[in-house]
């Protein structure tokens, strides 16, 4: 079994986006610590299975970030369950999770399942619009969400999600200083090695996503930048 607490760099692949076999091989053999499969829309059991089978040709750990209960399938090493703490809709905080537990609770392997406390900070992002996230928040608000995830809910992961735009480094630094047991994931807008390295100073795990589809060479350079190898 893999230890997620040591992961510094992960790639996130959207099953609803096209990725060539050649580029997938580059991603999986890049030295990244893991590949997360997940997206905000168009996620189906068919494209999740296609992605799973493709990634399983390689030795890299593989995680399904669950956004749709209908697209859950066995075969992943781990399952990340996001709870959008700054959502205005209870279904994205605990509602969908309750339905999933009602349907699948008896057969879940709890050693494979990790809950993520999300704080979505880009109002233009699909995930913000889907979950009706309250993005017009102060730093004090974000710190409070971090404390909620870390100290009150005791979640293993607190995820700062800027999704498509590069975030506030000082905020990431201050959030990290608040966390005692939760690991800090940062995702959003990383388009080059320098940005990845900058966020890696404070985030425990840097998530690289969209740049994979725009500039594969720049995406691959983020691995070494984060891991310092």
From Swiss-Prot:
InterPro entries registered for this protein in UniProt: GGGP/HepGP_synthase_I (IPR039074), GGGP/HepGP_synthase_sf (IPR038597), GGGP_HepGP_synthase (IPR008205)
Catalysed reactions listed for this entry: sn-glycerol 1-phosphate + all-trans-heptaprenyl diphosphate = 3-heptaprenyl-sn-glycero-1-phosphate + diphosphate
Top enzyme category: transferase
SUPFAM superfamilies assigned: FMN-linked oxidoreductases
Cofactor(s) needed for function: Mg(2+)
Keyword Lipid metabolism included in the entry's annotation: yes
Binding-site positions, Mg(2+): 14, 40
Residues that hold sn-glycerol 1-phosphate according to the record: 12, 159-164, 189, 209-210
Presence of keyword Electron transport: no
GO terms of molecular function: heptaprenylglyceryl phosphate synthase activity; magnesium ion binding
Subunit structure: Homodimer.
Protein's GO biological process: glycerophospholipid biosynthetic process
Protein name: Heptaprenylglyceryl phosphate synthase
Source species: Bacillus cereus (strain B4264)
Functional description taken from the UniProt entry: Prenyltransferase that catalyzes in vivo the transfer of the heptaprenyl moiety of heptaprenyl pyrophosphate (HepPP; 35 carbon atoms) to the C3 hydroxyl of sn-glycerol-1-phosphate (G1P), producing heptaprenylglyceryl phosphate (HepGP). This reaction is an ether-bond-formation step in the biosynthesis of archaea-type G1P-based membrane lipids found in Bacillales.
């Amino acid at each position: 079994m893999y230890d997620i607490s040591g992961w510094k760099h992960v790639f996130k692949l959207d099953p609803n986006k096209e990725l060539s076999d050649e580029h997938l091989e580059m991603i999986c053999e890049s030295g990244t610590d893991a590949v997360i499969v997940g997206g905000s829309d168009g996620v189906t059991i068919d494209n999740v299975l296609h992605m799973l089978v493709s990634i399983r040709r390689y030795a890299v750990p593989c995680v399904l970030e669950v956004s749709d209960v209908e697209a859950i399938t066995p075969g992943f090493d781990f399952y990340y369950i996001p709870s959008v703490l700054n959502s205005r809709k209870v279904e994205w905080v605990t509602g969908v999770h309750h339905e999933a537990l009602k349907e699948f609770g008896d057969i879940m392997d709890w050693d494979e399942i990790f809950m993520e406390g999300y704080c979505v900070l880009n109002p233009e992002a699909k995930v913000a619009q889907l979950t009706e996230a309250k993005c017009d928040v102060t730093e004090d608000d974000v710190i409070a969400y971090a404390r909620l995830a870390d100290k009150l809910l005791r979640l293993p992961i607190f995820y700062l999600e800027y999704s498509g735009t590069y975030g506030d480094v000082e905020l990431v630094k201050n959030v990290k200083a608040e966390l005692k047991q939760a690991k800090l994931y940062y995702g959003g807008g990383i388009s080059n090695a320098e940005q990845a390295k900058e966020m890696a100073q404070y985030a425990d795990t840097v998530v690289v996503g969209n740049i994979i589809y725009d500039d594969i060479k720049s995406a691959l350079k983020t691995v070494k930048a984060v891991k310092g190898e």
